[in-house]
């Protein structure tokens, strides 16, 4: 084991975080941890060039989105004594119980009398701890039923699709990131379930109507996909929208006011809504 390693830390606005994570993955960065309201990147190789590239990327995003403030802050790069980071990482990840669903890692034991969802967090697309995912897991236990045709839109690690499959739904998944599709398929294999269809892309590539759609994605993307989502809802279908910061909740409700809002949860600043396709007018 090498004696030293480099650690880069930065804070990024939540709505842009996934863009920076994708940027890091594209540059071959593998050791990434979200903690202390920011992002840690660790490597045995110098991260000076990556730090510089990160700042350039942030500047370009600021220009692209016509922002008058910095997207990232508290950027720091330090050299540290090495540890066994694999073991440290494992210690830091705790299982999560949401009603009767128990989400745990591949190295943690299952919980009796629960629906166990096994996730490999090394695949880097979420382990169920985010407030939005938590809300979706609660809702899916209520609305997932056998034989429903279901879509996990923006599947990430596949947790939500796996839960729907465990409840007997015929599940399809999609994500614009091919690595997310690979992650979801691997996690499905770990849990002994199959997805009926998986594709890299969005809902515009979907065929037919769904009885249940869950979209745990950011508000801006939900607003962009609003018409496509509605066009793929079966009569009386259930639509779960999540990943929505409370400051965007009014806009989401306005866009989906032609559907019946039947449930909602807010945890901290994160909102999740459940709609039924009883279209008004």
Curated annotation (Swiss-Prot):
Keywords: Cytoplasm, Methyltransferase, S-adenosyl-L-methionine, Transferase. It is found in: Cytoplasm. Its EC number is 2.1.1.-. It holds the Pfam family PrmA. Signal peptide: none annotated. One of its GO terms (cellular component) is cytoplasm. One of its GO terms (molecular function) is protein-lysine N-methyltransferase activity. GO terms for biological process: methylation. It catalyses: L-lysyl-[protein] + 3 S-adenosyl-L-methionine = N(6),N(6),N(6)-trimethyl-L-lysyl-[protein] + 3 S-adenosyl-L-homocysteine + 3 H(+). It is an enzyme of class 2 (transferase). S-adenosyl-L-methionine binds at residues 133, 154, 175, 216. It comes from the Bacteria. Methylates ribosomal protein L11. NCBIfam families: PRK00517.2-4. Belongs to the methyltransferase superfamily. PrmA family. This is Ribosomal protein L11 methyltransferase. It comes from Campylobacter jejuni (strain RM1221). The gene is prmA.
